[in-house]
């Protein structure tokens, strides 16, 4: 069943699961289940790995992102939530995703940003605190 929201509910093993239309069909970010339905591929959005998914499942009233949104996302970690937001905003939107921890930043670059053209990764080294965000964006 498709809602008017930018996400959908899909049936998986007899249960309703939150999902987004996969912007990169065939690509998984965190080993999430892929579901084929109505000619589209959906990625199940795990609320135990994403606070935004948990908020939606608990009745979030004002969902802030739509197709074509422009977003600055601080602390992308390994990319679970940002990947689903990427699905939602589509090719017409853009996300500037910032991460400072080098290990998780590598995972984010390998698993997410390298596959999604609507994500601009910004890896901010905290050891360079004299650089501000505008400086980083201009480099």
Where are these regions (language model features)?
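Conserved small/polar residues in nucleotide/adenosyl-binding loops
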Residues: 129-135
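Conserved SAM-binding motif I beta-strand of class I
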Residues: 94-99
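Conserved SAM-binding strand-loop segment of SAM-dependent methyltransferases
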Residues: 117-125
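Conserved SAM-binding loop of SAM-dependent methyltransferases across substrates and taxa
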Residues: 78-90
């Amino acid at each position: 069943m498709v809602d008017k929201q930018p996400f959908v509910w899909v049936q998986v093993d007899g249960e309703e699961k939150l999902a987004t239309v996969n912007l990169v069909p065939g690509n998984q970010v965190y080993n999430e289940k892929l579901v084929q339905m109505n000619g589209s591929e959906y990625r199940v959005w795990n609320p135990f790995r994403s606070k935004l998914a948990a908020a939606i499942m608990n009745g979030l009233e004002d969902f802030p992102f739509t197709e074509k949104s422009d977003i600055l996302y601080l602390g992308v970690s390994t990319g679970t939530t940002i990947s689903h937001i990427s699905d939602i905003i589509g090719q017409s939107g853009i996300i500037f995703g910032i991460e400072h921890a080098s290990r998780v930043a590598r995972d984010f670059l390998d698993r997410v940003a390298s596959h999604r053209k609507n994500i601009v990764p910004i890896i901010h080294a905290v050891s360079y605190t004299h650089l501000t965000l505008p400086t980083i964006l201009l480099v």
